[in-house]
């Protein structure tokens, strides 16, 4: 999205200036301006997937910064997308197959790129409760059908208007609360039974999370609410550093 993802990345950079210094120094932001399934259609060919940077350069020919970008100079590629599985012409099963393909292909930021999903949408970063995280009954799961007509955005706006206990991801301490809530939620979703959260962080890979999400999507028509950005931090900084930051 043109605004939300860029704003959230900027908030992350402000909250973690030292930890994300390398990322901040030469970051190039590119907006795809459509959903993940449209990207799939542009990338997919008979031999697999095309290079995402070259596809985006072709799409944004008028962008001089992007036009002058040498692919060999790009050391890391991170992709942030909403699940956006509601209101599609294709079936849920076909959409899940495409997402699975994409996650298996975009699984390394220094090679093809690393893909991160927000479930169901980027605004999910704004629903964490100060005490109950993402496990309150009103936000633990969200119906796919209720995402229609900006339904999830309206839900988030109403929640932020009516609730006095939302933890806003606008500073370092709050980001760490939001991150921990997302990791605890993933632990619940993935049935990781260890009593020690930090011992299972390494298992919270995007493709593994999606395997559990698609069971909910196909069988119950819901997703477990999760933000992409805590898992980006986990990937970028590593489980050990994240654990020390959350529980110093």
Stretches with model-predicted labels:
Residues 1-5:
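Short acidic, Gly/Ser-rich segments with clustered Asp/Glu that frequently serve as metal-coordination loops
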